[in-house]
Amino acid sequence: MSRKQLALFEPTLVVQALKEAVKKLNPQAQWRNPVMFIVWIGSLLTTCISIAMASGAMPGNALFSAAISGWLWVTVLFANFAEALAEGRSKAQANSLKGVKKTAFARKLREPKYGAAADKVPADQLRKGDIVLVEAGDIIPCDGEVIEGGASVDESAITGESAPVIRESGGDFASVTGGTRILSDWLVIECSVNPGETFLDRMIAMVEGAQRRKTPNEIALTILLIALTIVFLLATATLWPFSAWGGNAVSVTVLVALLVCLIPTTIGGLLSAIGVAGMSRMLGANVIATSGRAVEAAGDVDVLLLDKTGTITLGNRQASEFIPAQGVDEKTLADAAQLASLADETPEGRSIVILAKQRFNLRERDVQSLHATFVPFTAQSRMSGINIDNRMIRKGSVDAIRRHVEANGGHFPTDVDQKVDQVARQGATPLVVVEGSRVLGVIALKDIVKGGIKERFAQLRKMGIKTVMITGDNRLTAAAIAAEAGVDDFLAEATPEAKLALIRQYQAEGRLVAMTGDGTNDAPALAQADVAVAMNSGTQAAKEAGNMVDLDSNPTKLIEVVHIGKQMLMTRGSLTTFSIANDVAKYFAIIPAAFAATYPQLNALNIMRLHSPDSAILSAVIFNALIIVFLIPLALKGVSYKPLTASAMLRRNLWIYGLGGLLVPFIGIKVIDLLLTVCGLV
């Protein structure tokens, strides 16, 4: 579930952004953006020149210099406004989370058990390792792990999802987040962080931090923009002696205007806004990125590791068929399978009971009335079952049942091996049923591949992204599901060590890997992956290992994360192309206007036939300022994204933003020149 999206130009945010834009005019804020800092210096210089001209201290057209100065200040303000608006949208999204931190006091237990004596302490004084008790109606005061109890928890303040979730001690559902509310029962929680280090604190600090860390690509682009600025600064500085030698020296105001129009001010003014907006869009999708670096890495990812259950399939495996062993009738197998599943509350266990009832009208029986003993499933045994009278019935994985049969002096039938392979090749998971040492047959558990997932994988393949399915199933089952879903590769019988080894293998090949995880056993792989999306419902260890947290705990979100990352990179690249391309058109406006008096041959470049040198220069400066504000919506929303190959995407962007960057300034500058002339302003 995504958070409610803010309107692009929310009035409250616009007003606040305008105030922030003015505050950012101070030099300490400006020098962080070298391109706009040059514009700021130019604005200050032309302001001083226009004042000197107005007072008679310098010869020249004071009104023209004042107009140039005014529009240069507007250029700086628009760049500041773009960044402030992007930051304001992120802060507004985080403000809803600030309200979550309501807990004033907590009940700190003197001993780590329910019923122990408790002291009432301020929540902000809780330290890592402290034990607290929370009951129905309480706000959880800190991030932590449940060490005793189980409760229904409302996490809507953080996730936006209204349905409560169960949190209990043990397993992968023991992690709780400070600021969420207990709806029923109680929990004893061990705090896992110190004050100011909670999940909420980190998220709010990230989006409200005064200094956002630049990503590697952003730094590289900034260096390129600085290099271009230095080149154009040196070129402009050499033009004054050339014009003076020609007998008609160009004024400093015109040279400043020329410099500002030559340097890439459009992308320079929008670069920070694009980065902030990328993280904001991620937050809008209910994904918390710990840094802009993580969002950028998502755009460069070329390998996706996707869990089969819940991501590729619906995750609710259902019993679909009873396949008896040779010499066993299907009803006998169904009866034994139902008995073994009577106390099994998993979706798979319930589906076995229901299938036996539907096929053979076998009614459910009460385990207690039968004086039976239920044997629960464990990760070590990998099977479950029931002991009733003198019958010992088990169901489980093929390997587990094989070991069980051989341990009881039996022999695993060859025909059952064949039936297991047949089920696996169909993409189902085989469960073998045994009574004593006699194998009765196989239950086929079928998981449904999500609709449309094959098409999504085909789109990712077009983009050059390899998809790898991760599953605990055997190789035959994994291969069948992988073929049905359309993934490029799969890892069967996956263990945490195998996942980690696979990630390292891809990274050694120079690839960037993304994955999701929710358990403590996923933490090593999450820490190794370039983009690691931890589920909010997962353990604290998983969330700390990842560089993103999905508040919806939806493994499929990884594909959306990659799309948002690629959209941010495309937006930055597209606007850079547009910015550099539209500088070319400005050359045709300013250079003939500034130097035609000295070098008449330059009139040949005046293809726009602008009214006068002053109107040409002023029109170019005005366009240079206005184009920033017109591109703010594109910087904040991102360019339209379509899954294409890298070469097709490059061609598309060059046509739209390269050619568009050449044509738009010609039209815009000409229109502004006509308006200035008609209004008699030049």
UniProtKB/Swiss-Prot annotation:
Q: Where is the active site?
A: 307
How is this protein named in the record?
Answer: Potassium-transporting ATPase ATP-binding subunit
EC number(s) stated in the UniProt entry for this protein = 7.2.2.6
Provide this UniProt record's keywords sorted from A to Z: ATP-binding, Cell inner membrane, Cell membrane, Ion transport, Magnesium, Membrane, Metal-binding, Nucleotide-binding, Phosphoprotein, Potassium, Potassium transport, Translocase, Transmembrane, Transmembrane helix, Transport
What organism does this protein naturally occur in? Escherichia coli O139:H28 (strain E24377A / ETEC)
According to its UniProt entry, the function of this protein is described as:
Part of the high-affinity ATP-driven potassium transport (or Kdp) system, which catalyzes the hydrolysis of ATP coupled with the electrogenic transport of potassium into the cytoplasm. This subunit is responsible for energy coupling to the transport system and for the release of the potassium ions to the cytoplasm.
| List of residues binding Mg(2+) | 518, 522
**What are the recorded GO MF terms, alphabetically?**
ATP binding; ATP hydrolysis activity; magnesium ion binding; P-type potassium transmembrane transporter activity
The UniProt family comment states: Belongs to the cation transport ATPase (P-type) (TC 3.A.3) family. Type IA subfamily.
Note the superkingdom of the native organism.
Bacteria
